[in-house]
Amino acid sequence: MQVPRVKLLMGSGAMFVFAIIYGWVIFPKILKFMISKQVTLKPGSDVRELWSNTPFPLHFYFYVFNVTNPDEVSEGAKPRLQEVGPFVFDEWKDKYDLEDDVVEDTVSFTMRNTFIFNAKETLPLTGEEEIILPHPIMQPGGISVQREKAAMMELVSKGLSIVFPDAKAFLKAKFMDLFFRGINVDCSSEEFAAKALCTVFYTGEVKQAKQVNQTHFLFSFMGQANHSDAGRFTVCRGVKNNKKLGKVVKFADEPEQDIWPDGECNTFVGTDSTVFAPGLKKEDGLWAFTPDLCRSLGAYYQHKSSYHGMPSMRYTLDLGDIRADERLHCFCEDPEDLDTCPPKGTMNLAACVGGPLMASMPHFYLGDPKLIADVDGLNPNERDHAVYIDFELMSGTPFQAAKRLQFNLDMEPVEGIEPMRNLPKLILPMFWVEEGVHLNKTYTNLVKYTLFLGLKINSVLRWSLITFSLVGLMFSAYLFYHKSDSLDITSILKENNKVDDVASTKEPLPPANPKQSTTAHPVQVPNTLIPGTNPATHPAPHLKMEHRERY
């Protein structure tokens, strides 16, 4: 049976075109469309439920810099630091008081973070270790007064000596007291200076202090932030425009901040860091607004990575060089005076938190080398101190991440406060934190079996179709080539047989010589002709025939 060459060629070509168009154009569009419809913050959706109440805790680590030579530093010596940690906590995130605006396609909510001490993961530490840090009230308060309200220095100095009798520039206290339980602030004195100092506690200006009775407060770095309001956000739901999913449009009911001297730095860029839009391009970066810094930060693509066998993109970020980057000059105290810009790798938080604090990467990683040289005990490296995010772009899923940040005191001598008079001027690391997440198989399997399984099936299908179509195209090409380059032997033989049949029906002419015998012995011709032919009817052309015809 003959193979239908034309049909085979057309079918193989159609299969090849279909595999290309469906595998690389139609299927990705269908998949992206399905993801865009599923990944929204519309009430009742699975993503909305996971987003509003994270069903697993994040890992939160504290690393504290213990000052081992506090008395020497008080006299101007170089600080020697000892890193103590990690102190491990489970951080639970939830959002409450959710309000949807269907017209604007937004949802407003209040963020809440709850920290629970994980004693098992903290071992061999217990949280009861004594740490020596800059006095968390005296030093920031004294420096702020010297910079902004120098005329009140004498009153503040006297008030500090009453509220904190015999206090030094550095305080020794247990980790849990400094960070969660609180250190005692006694405002029971009737002295005017003490009452004036305690006014900032009673009015709530010191956000880290909690009033326990009429005359006493407890001060801690994190106690007030634990299981309390962490800010009111308004973000896009992504129902009308999936590309805007999670985008912050308001914080504290304001469309922009009023903290930095230039409007661009006050703009909200990115999400609340708990959700990202699907279908991002790697060059877009991952942007999120960070209330602790009063600033939006963008992570940039670093390299390809993988998580539990699934491909992902590795992103990282840093605080940049505010002085060198013109776009960041609005984070300087005076954008027109670059001398007011913080050193490379740091950010001045004074305008954000109301105190002389600086943010940086842990151990001043990627920062100005002078910052590291000013103290002993730092060892910056990428593995331990860089920020990273392993992100799946198509679904907008962060597989794992480590957000790291260090808080430093912008220390300087304060002439009006005796214990601080001889302090060196430098940026002193106090502690750094890491907020980490690593999705387990329960959640990665959702991505694996809905996204990657579909991609795998599509990949196998399209390459199988391409393979079959190429085989068909090559076979049909072979058939066409064989047809044009070879003889149709059967047709030729049939044509020759027809000619011989006609010749055999002709009546023979009489012999030219009557005396010549009309019977001749035929010459025996070897059968060297084409197989299937009759040697008698097809004599070899090079042999002379006994019988000749006259014309």
Swiss-Prot record:
GO molecular function (one): scavenger receptor activity
Name of a matching Pfam family: CD36
Protein name: Sensory neuron membrane protein 1
Regions that span the bilayer: 8-28, 460-480
GO CC terms of this entry: cilium; cytoplasm; dendrite; neuronal cell body; plasma membrane
Disulfide bond residue pairs: 265-330, 294-352, 332-341
Subcellular compartments: Cell membrane
